[in-house]
Regions:
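Low-acidity, Ser/Thr- and Arg-rich intrinsically disordered low-complexity segments
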Residues: 1, 5-20, 26-34
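N-terminal metal-binding scaffold of metallo-dependent hydrolase/deaminase domains
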Residues: 32-80, 379
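Divalent metal-coordination and catalytic microenvironments
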Residues: 48, 63, 90, 101, ...
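Alpha-helical scaffold segments that flank or form the walls of functional sites
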Residues: 64, 92-93, 110-173, 195-206
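Active-site gating loops and adjacent loop-to-helix segments of metal-dependent hydrolytic enzymes
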Residues: 108-139, 177-183, 247-289, 359
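Active-site core of metal-dependent hydrolases
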Residues: 208-328, 334-337, 342-343
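His/Asp/Glu-enriched, well-ordered alpha-helical/loop segment
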Residues: 263, 287, 326-402
Length: 412
């Protein structure tokens, strides 16, 4: 077994800030984290392998980083760099991770939901989100963000139903694309839901944050609201996102007009246009006018459902709620991203933990897994300076080191 320890050498926001990350190579028995502190200076970093993620991995490659964390150059051989300038590490170097799907504002619900009970039972816990003080929520948000930083994450696609996370995000520890989520199964309340979303989106944008209005899921947003979301897309928007095919019941609702979701929606007198106007979950892509969409979960997607959009898998959340995983062979690995989902449906906010599950249930090699964790999420979310070691980018630098123990140590 191979245990890996990772220390972050350069953060994406500030070269003098540090973050940590653990990653995998083949099989794992234990993991640990290392935080690296250093003085700002031009650095020449090398390890057993360098994973630039826009070209093939380079054995004993050298990464030159400026004092603001910007990639200056890549050298394919250590002899190209004066030996006294080299910082040599065991393991591999890769960019910082991108968490393509999270619900940071639900962090205070960690541990409340029983595992494996399905989405409808899980949703009852989410409805308890307001039974907490603002202090409880804000402390949980700050702690969860610190966890992401400690786990080597440099950017996040975050679902927002409230402005609870805005204060923390304004500290700019991480990059965020904020998806202002709408949920409304009653046609007579569509305008209220939509106007609230516009107000919240504008609040985030006024604070300098990327923000777009999005739909929660095909079963929770009727066509009339979906069209409003499509029409709200403006020059500041880059991407939409939606939870899709997360459960068997969702497919049964649209394809067979039966099942637990069907009974639930009828039981709450939801507008019937949700299921009558759609024969498949993926029909909503037409309602969104062909916009660029990040489709999240896809646990029960089939090969014929896959389009040219980006896809995000959250395997630990899928196991937590539905005890099921997607068929990873159906995805284009250039369009596949990974997310943690929320602490309400996960035990950690760790891309490593997600990748361990993907690795065990796919034939993806290490370079592909790293692309899924770094490059693809950055491309999907429009963070052009992240994701690879291309010249001029500021992606963060993560060291992945093989160790025989799990002790936390400071390298510098």
């Amino acid at each position: 077994c191979l245990a890996l320890k990772l220390g972050s050498l350069c953060s994406a926001q500030n070269f003098c800030k540090s973050s940590t990350l653990v990653f995998l190579m083949s099989f794992f028995s234990s993991i640990s984290f290392t935080k690296i502190y250093y003085f700002c200076a031009m650095r020449f970093l090398t390890a057993d392998y360098l994973f630039p993620l826009y070209i093939a991995p380079i054995k004993e490659g050298v990464l030159q980083i400026s004092d603001d964390g910007q990639v200056v150059a890549i050298f394919k051989n250590r002899i190209e760099v004066p030996q006294d300038k080299l910082e040599i590490f065991e393991g591999i170097l890769c960019p910082g991770f991108v968490n393509a799907h999270c619900h940071l504002e639900l962090s205070h619900l960690k541990g409340n939901a029983e595992k494996g009970k399905g989405f409808l039972e899980f949703s009852k816990i989410i409805r308890q989100r307001d039974n907490y003080t603002d202090t409880d929520k804000l402390q949980a948000i700050e702690k969860a963000e610190q966890e992401m930083i400690a786990n080597g994450i440099v950017a996040v696609g975050d679902i927002c139903n409230t402005g609870d996370t805005l204060v923390q995000k304004q500290k700019e520890h991480l990059k965020y694309y904020n998806f202002i989520e709408t949920f409304g199964v009653y046609v007579n309340k569509v305008d209220i839901v939509y106007n609230q979303a516009i107000e919240l989106r504008n609040e985030f944008r006024s604070a300098g944050q990327k923000a777009s209005i999005v739909a929660h899921a095909p079963y929770s947003v009727p066509p009339v609201l979906m069209r409003k979301i499509n029409n709200a897309f403006d020059d500041n928007d880059e991407l939409l996102t939606i939870h899709i095919q997360e459960t068997k019941e969702e497919n049964q609702l649209f394809e067979n007009k039966k099942g637990n979701f069907f009974d639930w929606l009828r039981g709450i007198n939801a507008t019937s246009s949700i299921w009558l106007n759609r024969n498949k979950s993926t029909y909503v892509l037409q309602e969104l006018g062909g916009k660029k969409v990040l489709l999240v979960h896809n646990t029960f997607a089939k090969k014929e459902d896959i389009t040219d959009n980006y896809y995000c898998t959250c395997p630990r959340a899928n196991l937590y709620i539905e005890n099921a995983l997607p068929d990873y062979s159906i995805f284009d690995t250039d369009k596949l991203c990974v997310g943690t989902d929320s602490l309400a449906s996960n035990d950690s906010l760790s891309i490593l933990d997600e990748l361990l599950i993907i690795q065990s249930n796919s034939n993806f090699d290490l370079n592909t897994l790293l692309k899924i964790a770094c490059k693809n999420g950055a491309k999907a979310l429009g963070f052009e300076k992240l994701g690879t070691f291309e010249k001029g980018k500021i992606p963060g630098v993560n060291l992945i080191k093989s160790l025989a123990d799990t002790k936390i140590t400071k390298l510098i």
